[in-house]
Amino acid sequence: MSLSPQQQAVIEWAKQAQSGQLTTRALNLVARAGCGKTFTLMATTEVLEGEGFIGAYNRAIADEIKAKLISKGLDPRRVSAGTLHSAGMNAWRRIAKDVKVEREKVQIIIDALIADLVKKAQTAETAEKADRYRAKATTAKTLTGFVKKAVSLAKQRAFGFVHSFEDMSKWFELIEHFGLEDDLEFEVDMDEAVRLCIHIFKTSISQDRDLIDYDDMILAPLIHNARMWPKDFVLIDEAQDTNPARRALAIKMLKPKTGILIAVGDPAQAIYGFTGADSDAMDLIKEQLNSDTLPLNVTYRCPKAVVAVAQQWVPDITAHESAPEGIV
C-alpha cells in the first residue's frame, strides 16, 4: 500500500524532526476515523532511528500493534509497544522488585484507618476523646466511596507531581470538575472530606514500594522519580483520551533534548473524561510541547454519503475519492 500525501507529510516531518531541522520535536497528528492511523504509525516507526515506544490505550490494542511491528520485521528490542501502565510498571519494578499489585489498595488503607480509630475510641482516656474518634471513624466509613473516587482521580491527575497533593484548592477543583459532591447523599464538611482524601493519598504514596494499584503504575514512577530507559521516540495512540499522569510519563520516557513525541488522536472522539482524561488533551500537549500539527482526515472506511453526514460534527473529514456513494 502506497502512502497518501498526508501520510507522506508525517513521514517527512519525522525525518526532519529527528535530524534537528525543525524548531520542535513534538507533533500532534489529528487522525479522524478510518483515515489509516495505524498504517501511518507503522510507516513512521520504520523511518525513525533509535529506540522507540508506542503507547496504546489498552492491552488489546497494544497486542495488535506488537503483532504488526513483528510482521514489519521490526526488532521488539528496538521498538516496543504496550500501555503506559505497563511502561510505568516496568520502571517501578526496577526500584521495588517485590512490589505487589492490589486493586483495592485504597480501600485497604481506609479500612485500616477506621479500625485504628475504633481501637483508639475503645482505649481513649476520656469519653470526649472516645466520641471524637468514633465520629472520625463514622465519617471515614461514610465517605469511603467518595474518597476512593477522589484519590483515584487525583492519581490520574498526577497530584504530587504537577503540584503538591496537600494543596486543598486543587482537591476542590477536582471535586467540582468531576461532580463528586453530587454523589454524596448527605451534607458533609467538605474541608474535613478533603483532609481525609489528602491523608489517604499520602498514606498510599508511602506504601508504593510494597503495594500499588492500577493508578500507581503510572504515578509511582513520576512522584518517586524512577529512572526510565530513555527513548529516541515515543508515539502515543488515542492521545485525545490521555490524562495528566499518562502524558507526564510519556514525556519522561523521552531522551532529553533529542527525543521525539508524536501524539496521535481525534479530539472529536474524546469520550473518557469521566475516567480522568482531559477533553482538550491534544490542545494541552500542543501547549506544553509547542507541537506541530498535521492532519489525517481522508477516511478509507466510510461511503461518501456517510461522510457528508459526519461533516456536520467533524467538518474536515473527507471521503476518499474511491469511496462508494452509499446510502444513509
Regions found by a protein language model. Give the residues of each.
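A generic structural signal for alpha->beta connector loops
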Residues: 51, 76-78, 230, 258, ...
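Accessory N-terminal region flanking or inserted into the helicase ATPase core
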Residues: 1-12, 16, 21-30, 40, ...
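A basic- and aromatic-enriched beta-loop-alpha substructure that forms the phosphate/nucleotide-
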Residues: 88-153, 159
